[in-house]
């Protein structure tokens, strides 16, 4: 248990040290009605259940601590395919790599750190989504806090909608990406 807490603390510290904001000396007005880039993606997650190592795209590396009914303390790492449509078998256009941890003791709640990594003819680079994901809500807005490549220093909003759940083995999330600072 001490090793799990140490591992969790080390991962959180690494994320905080790797993410930084660039402060500029000028204010740029943002038109929230007109993002500079917008696209809709679909994340597909297959949870590891002990028998599906070849197909699993996520795995719990710290299990719930038994402190309630809402998986408090569970820590999941993921490398999920992202498609342009809802079909899991469609060609992936990106991957979501990162983690989420359940941190609500009174309701299902997760804090996420995801990097959407593109390597296609259309886009190269990545952007990062971080924040509170109250996934029992129909839609959730999470901040996009930066990026690389085609998404260098981008900022925006990712609106998440869980559009399919198959027990604890599979879920699909629609990502409505709206970027408001674009340099490419």
UniProtKB/Swiss-Prot annotation:
Alphabetical GO biological process terms: phenylpropanoid biosynthetic process
Keyword Ribosomal protein attributed: no
InterPro entries: Allene_oxi_cyc_Dirigent, Dirigent
Gene3D superfamilies per UniProt: Allene oxide cyclase-like
Disulfide-linked positions: 36-182
A Pfam family assignment: Dirigent
Keywords: Apoplast, Disulfide bond, Glycoprotein, Secreted, Signal
Cell division found in the keyword field: no
Secretion signal span: 1-20
Sugar attachment sites: 55, 119
Location relative to the cell: Secreted, Extracellular space, Apoplast
GO cellular component: apoplast
Protein purpose: Dirigent proteins impart stereoselectivity on the phenoxy radical-coupling reaction, yielding optically active lignans from two molecules of coniferyl alcohol in the biosynthesis of lignans, flavonolignans, and alkaloids and thus plays a central role in plant secondary metabolism.
Subunit structure, as described in the record: Homodimer.
Family: Belongs to the plant dirigent protein family.
Protein name: Dirigent protein 14
């Amino acid at each position: 248990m001490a090793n799990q807490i140490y591992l969790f603390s080390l991962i959180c510290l690494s994320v905080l040290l790797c993410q930084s904001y660039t402060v500029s000396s000028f204010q740029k007005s943002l038109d929230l009605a007109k993002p500079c880039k917008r696209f809709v993606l679909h994340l597909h997650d297959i949870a590891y259940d002990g028998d599906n190592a070849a197909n699993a795209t996520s795995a719990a590396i710290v299990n719930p601590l038994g402190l309630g009914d809402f998986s408090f303390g569970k820590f999941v790492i993921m490398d999920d395919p992202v498609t342009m449509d809802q079909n899991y078998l469609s060609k992936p256009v990106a991957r979501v790599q990162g983690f989420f941890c359940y941190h609500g003791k009174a309701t299902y709640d997760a804090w996420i750190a995801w990097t959407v990594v593109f390597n296609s003819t259309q886009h190269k680079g990545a952007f990062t989504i971080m924040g509170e994901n109250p996934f029992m809500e129909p839609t959730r807005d999470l901040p996009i806090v930066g990026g690389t490549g085609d998404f260098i220093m981008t900022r925006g909003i990712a609106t998440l909608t869980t559009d399919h759940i198959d027990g604890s083995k599979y879920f699909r999330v629609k990502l409505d990406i709206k970027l408001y600072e674009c340099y490419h």
